[in-house]
Amino acid sequence: KDMNQLRQFVDNWKDKKIGGILVLGAVQGDKVNLISAVSEEAIKAGYHAGKLLKEVATRCGGNGGGRPDMAQAGGKNPAELGTALDYVSTWVKEQQA
């Protein structure tokens, strides 16, 4: 999926007022597209989409960042996308500590 499709998914998620944290990743050719969104409630609890996605992106050869509510990133190592996405739960737990 390209970044526009991922952004559409995030917009739909936001429109439905689903709380929490959303992180999506997709391989496009030899690149990785990543996007994250954080609900208002989660932002108030200290979560930040840009900080999260920066950490996730580094795990698949990329970088990125963004606002507290939404962030985008790219990566250069599609084989590591699964590992990068697995890190999300670790990051969330670390923020709770």
Language-model regions, residue ranges each:
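Glycine-rich, acidic loop segments that terminate in or are immediately followed by a histidine
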Residues: K1-A97
